[in-house]
A protein has these predicted regions:
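Transmembrane beta-strands of outer-membrane beta-barrel pores
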Residues: 79-85, 135-141, 234-238, 290-292, ...
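Transmembrane beta-barrel domains of outer membrane proteins
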Residues: 57, 63-67, 119-125, 219-221, ...
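Solvent-exposed loop segments that connect transmembrane elements
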Residues: 93-103, 149-201, 238-273, 307-365
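Gram-negative bacterial Sec-dependent N-terminal signal peptides
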Residues: 8-31
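Membrane-embedded beta-strand positions of outer-membrane beta-barrel proteins
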Residues: 75-79, 133, 218, 230, ...
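Outer-membrane beta-barrel channels and translocator barrels
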Residues: 70, 126-129, 223-225, 290-293
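N-terminal, post-signal peptide beta-strand-biased segments of exported outer-membrane/organellar beta-barrel
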Residues: 27-146, 152-160, 164-165
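Residues that define the transmembrane beta-barrel architecture of outer-membrane proteins
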Residues: 57, 113-118, 210-214, 276-282, ...
Length: 365
């Protein structure tokens, strides 16, 4: 995070307030991410150009200018509320194969709600010195939830469905040629994968980001017109991302029955990721006032945060696919050969040999 602010305003008579408690609807500054939130005092919601003002909110916006306030203690306590929606459009062509929502482009809607976004600014002025501290959510500030997941999630499901249908068609073609029955269907029937790549699934995603910032510093008044500030902000990052894709069905076939019929979650995808870290931001500032004019500048150095990652992920059990596919083919073919008059033992042996020939065919593997 790095910000550089330079501004000036024509000074007017300021009313000093020792304690301010306010509530306001936050601007989209609390959208999240690694950028610095600038609405760290509710006065920002009333007027965004605060960087050259002299007031208690200057502990963040103009820390060098706070020393020009009256002597004694100054405190501001802020409570903000944020609500916003995020809409992501995706026009991936295969979304039309979704049997529950066969349209494209598709809009994936997320909702973010943060009922309490607290912050405070404190200053103690004595003589030429001003000791200051503040706390705020310098980044992030809430949780965004996508009840139907994201387009990138559905894209994986749509492509998986097409790949499954393609594999099913190839297996059926090779199987039919091997048995001398072109057009034979085992996996491409409407009761199985089908041939259109149709799919259904359930999905969910939420992300939470909080970057807590605690700043301390001091300003010194060199003259009645000029002051300077130096301080540091410590930032503690805490984030979480959680999402899943489950109950994937290709055609009328639950995908887990092919991957591992003994585990209903064999085809599920799940992500749970926690991140945390600490960083520090050096801050310097100057303020110069003359007559009815006030000039100020503040520079925040880049904050370097090394995030520690803890993830618990679940991916589909693809490794069991060949064995499960083989068992299904052997079982189905055994029944076919038994119906043609073979003994169960011979039918199973022929079914096993046929399955081996099909699955090792160059068109399948």
């Amino acid at each position: 995070m790095r910000t550089f602010i330079f501004n000036f305003i024509k000074m007017k008579k300021l009313k000093l307030v020792s304690l301010a408690i306010a509530m306001a609807c936050a601007t989209p500054s609390f959208a999240g991410g690694l950028l610095t939130n600038t609405n760290q005092h509710v006065a920002f919601n009333r007027m965004m150009s605060r960087e050259a003002s002299i007031g208690i909110d200057g502990v963040y916006y103009n820390p060098a200018g706070v020393v020009f306030m009256g002597e004694g203690h100054h405190l501001a306590i802020n409570w903000q509320l944020a609500y916003q929606t995020r809409s992501i459009e995706n026009d991936y062509a295969l979304f039309t194969n979704n049997v529950n929502n066969p349209i494209t482009p598709r809009t994936f809607k997320g909702e973010a709600f943060a009922p309490v976004i607290p912050s405070f600014q404190y200053a103690y002025n004595k003589g030429r010195w001003s000791l200051q501290a503040s706390f705020a959510l310098t980044g992030g500030g809430g949780k965004c939830t996508f009840d139907n997941g994201l387009g990138s999630f559905e894209k994986i499901v749509a492509e998986t469905a097409m790949a499954a249908c393609g594999l099913a068609k190839t297996v059926d073609n090779v199987l039919g040629n091997t048995l001398g029955q072109p057009g034979m269907q085992m996996f491409t029937t409407d009761q199985a994968f089908g041939q259109k790549g149709e799919y259904s699934y359930n999905s969910y995603m939420h992300g939470r980001q909080y970057y807590y910032g605690l700043s301390v510093g001091a300003a010194y008044k060199f003259s009645d017109n000029f002051s300077a500030f130096a301080g540091v902000r410590g930032v503690y990052a805490s984030t979480n991302y959680y999402g899943y894709v489950e109950n994937i069905k290709v055609g009328n076939m639950p995908l887990y029955k092919v991957l591992d019929p003994n585990k209903e979650n064999a085809a599920n995808i799940e992500l749970s990721c926690d991140q945390s870290g600490i960083g520090f931001t050096p801050i310097i500032g100057v303020d110069f006032k003359t007559g009815k004019w006030n000039f100020s500048a503040k520079y925040e150095f880049k904050t370097r945060i090394r995030l520690k990652n803890k993830a618990v992920n679940q991916a589909p059990s693809i490794s069991a696919l060949p064995d499960n596919l083989s068992r299904q083919m052997v079982g189905t073919l055994t029944q076919v050969f038994t119906n043609k008059g073979m003994t169960p033992e011979n039918a199973q042996a022929v079914a096993a040999n046929t399955t081996q020939a099909v699955l090792t065919n160059g068109d399948v593997v």
